Amino acid sequence: MTDIIRSDAATLAAKIAIKEVSSAEITRACLDQIEATDETYHAFLHVAADEALAAAAAIDKQVAAGEPLPSALAGVPLALKDVFTTSDMPTTCGSKILEGWRSPYDATLTARLRAAGIPILGKTNMDEFAMGSSTENSAYGPTRNPWNLDRVPGGSGGGSAAALAAFQAPLAIGSDTGGSIRQPAALTATVGVKPTYGTVSRYGLVACASSLDQGGPCARTVLDTALLHQVIAGHDPRDSTSVDAEVPDVVGAARAGAVGDLRGVRVGVVRQLHGGEGYQPGVLASFEAAVEQLTALGAEVSEVDCPHFDHALAAYYLILPSEVSSNLARFDAMRYGLRVGDDGTRSAEEVMAMTRAAGFGPEVKRRIMIGTYALSAGYYDAYYNQAQKVRTLIARDLDAAYRSVDVLVSPTTPTTAFRLGEKVDDPLAMYLFDLCTLPLNLAGHCGMSVPSGLSPDDGLPVGLQIMAPALADDRLYRVGAAYEAARGPLLSAI
């Protein structure tokens, strides 16, 4: 079993195709690992053993019959963040207000996974409605980092990252609103990609902030992440924000990058995301070593200035709560989910107020209040409108930067994983943890976090963030795969 659960997805898929191992064997090995370890890590909110084994059996039947398989990852199981709707298992978004709720339909991303023959092991833990940076805001308890059980795995998608690091699954799906894929990847020594906004369907992705949210792939290697990216990307007419454009050849880029030649690739180091208050020395040392490695691979490295990045955090934490305030108004106790106080003596308004008070956690309530205030008539122009203007300036900074470089790089996070409970009562400190990742969400561009070693400060994982323009996701994979090949694999400490 150990060989199976520690194998990369591409290797497992190849073995399935030649009947060296069955999808059922792989899926059972992952389920056994979940059963043996998840009491410790709490990566999963729901495990769908029967459904996953049935999907695996269907692929094995196709292999036995000599039929062509539906995708390059057919038969390789996956962990799905509990923010994507699934018709056959609960979708809670880490919130009490949706406890036990089952969607009548699959998200487009879920449907594409099923069509590709990928068994879904279950739904992973997350910060409530994707609001948080540590997975401590889940109504169902925190997830622990497999590298150190006293540390957080990042957020909001810490469950998906922990499942990969604990060898519970070879593939995972996350969503990224301000770094929720990339940041957990950095803290768990896994790979996570935020695709270009609009290239992966948001239909069935329960909204946090609609102009920022983006589903994306996670795995333990760059190639595995590319193979999963290829499965989930593509235009969806049911998503009004979906981009009708050709998906870049991310798999070809990953394979080309693995050769380890970056000659001719121009890499920019973002001055505003490299050093300053709040950055751990070990993270900066790891980043500088990564830049040296890129140079050794032939890349042309220069420093790039993005002056409005200094205002990105403030703009983000006005735009995001404003969209949260609007999106979460749908949880009104009338249509689905929790209902409190409906004893026939109270008005609909009273029932709604009681339900939202009982069903939402402190961080969700905080952001609803901030957003409602920012959108109010007396403050809309002073706060929300100004934040949107800063957002435009950040996008212009990036556009200007890409006129002289092909990709940008920075640390993914300013520090390694912090201790459980360390920042939970200090929301401003928690928000600062998204400093390096959220500018890409504001601009709609793409980004990757790839492991860049262990910090000399505490021995915990550090991530290198690679950024590229919209619809240039293939650049991430070329550079990421080249760096990964030079650095070598970095697996979990378990």
From Swiss-Prot:
It catalyses: L-glutamyl-tRNA(Gln) + L-glutamine + ATP + H2O = L-glutaminyl-tRNA(Gln) + L-glutamate + ADP + phosphate + H(+). Keywords: ATP-binding, Ligase, Nucleotide-binding, Protein biosynthesis. Its EC number is 6.3.5.7. Transmembrane segments: none annotated. The active site is at K81 (charge relay system), S156 (charge relay system), S180 (acyl-ester intermediate). InterPro entries: Amidase (IPR000120), Amidase_CS (IPR020556), Amidase_dom (IPR023631), AS_sf (IPR036928), GatA (IPR004412). It is an enzyme of class 6 (ligase). GO terms for molecular function: ATP binding; glutaminyl-tRNA synthase (glutamine-hydrolyzing) activity. One of its GO terms (cellular component) is glutamyl-tRNA(Gln) amidotransferase complex. PANTHER family: GLUTAMYL-TRNA(GLN) AMIDOTRANSFERASE SUBUNIT A (PTHR11895:SF151), TRANSAMIDASE (PTHR11895). Belongs to the amidase family. GatA subfamily. Allows the formation of correctly charged Gln-tRNA(Gln) through the transamidation of misacylated Glu-tRNA(Gln) in organisms which lack glutaminyl-tRNA synthetase. The reaction takes place in the presence of glutamine and ATP through an activated gamma-phospho-Glu-tRNA(Gln). Heterotrimer of A, B and C subunits. This is Glutamyl-tRNA(Gln) amidotransferase subunit A.
